[in-house]
């Protein structure tokens, strides 16, 4: 019964914190802090999804905060699942390169996985796809509570994953070869794009000198930045400084973000 009470207290915390809103206070027989110290007859106050006070029975509870009392319970920090591809409608993609994917579009907030994790005392999960790809999509850190992905999200910049453990039917060497080929292809594509942009610039300049008016550039309203200078990694090449996000496709943008150092990158290796 004591364990059940403890888990119920944990669930109460997460449900509040996951939504990043709401307030709750808990008084319990013991509160175990992250450093291992124990507070007897402790009080914990959470406001707007964040712990604001922790201490003994003398901690002041704001008048507008719901107080829950568990005189026999032990409150302790929840667990953090650092790496998981559960809780999604599809944990992996068949394509080897998928940096254009975002786990936001795949997480199922009502999956029983999140309910089971919450009951077990887990308060944060790093959900990231891609064990069966070479480069997977973007992950995020979520709490196992909330009715929408926005309510669940604790951090949306977990980064992407490179898997060097071979997927079914592949060897490790073929997995790494696919990664090298992807980088080589990107570099070739960028050089071709740079040359085309350089040529287009020369044509526009010639037309301008000839007195031919060009149509003014009109913003297309998409999310991609049209400013030049997007490529910051690697050696210089013709037209490198002219390339913008808008000149690339989704896969190329994801690869460039990795090589530019704009994405946190994790390496998945099932064995050393």
At which residue positions do the language-model features occur?
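Short, solvent-exposed loop/turn and secondary-structure capping segments
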Residues: 37, 56, 79, 90-93, ...
């Amino acid at each position: 019964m004591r364990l059940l009470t403890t888990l119920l207290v944990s669930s109460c915390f997460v449900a509040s914190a996951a939504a990043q809103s709401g307030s709750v206070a808990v008084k319990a027989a013991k509160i175990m802090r992250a450093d291992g110290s124990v507070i007897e007859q402790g009080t914990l106050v959470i406001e707007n999804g964040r712990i604001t006070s922790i201490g003994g029975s003398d901690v002041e509870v704001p008048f507008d905060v719901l107080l829950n009392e568990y005189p026999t319970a032990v409150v302790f920090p929840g667990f953090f699942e650092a790496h998981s591809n559960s809780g999604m409608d599809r944990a992996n993609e068949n394509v080897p390169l998928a940096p254009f994917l975002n786990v936001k579009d795949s997480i199922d907030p009502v999956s029983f996985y999140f309910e089971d994790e919450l009951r077990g005392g887990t308060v944060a999960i790093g959900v990231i796809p891609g064990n069966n790809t070479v480069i997977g999509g973007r992950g995020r850190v979520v709490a196992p509570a909330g009715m929408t992905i926005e309510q669940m999200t604790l951090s949306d910049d977990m980064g992407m994953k490179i898997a060097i453990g071979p997927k079914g039917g592949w060897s490790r060497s073929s997995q790494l070869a696919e990664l090298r080929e992807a980088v080589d292809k990107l570099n070739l594509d960028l050089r071709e794009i740079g040359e085309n942009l350089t040529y287009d610039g020369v044509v526009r300049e010639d037309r301008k000198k000839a007195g031919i008016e060009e149509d003014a550039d009109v913003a297309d309203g998409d999310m991609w930045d049209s400013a030049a200078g997007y490529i910051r990694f690697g050696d210089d090449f013709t037209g490198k400084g002219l390339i913008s996000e808008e000149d690339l496709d989704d896969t190329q943008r994801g690869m460039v973000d990795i090589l530019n150092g704009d994405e946190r990158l994790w390496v998945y290796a099932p064995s050393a």
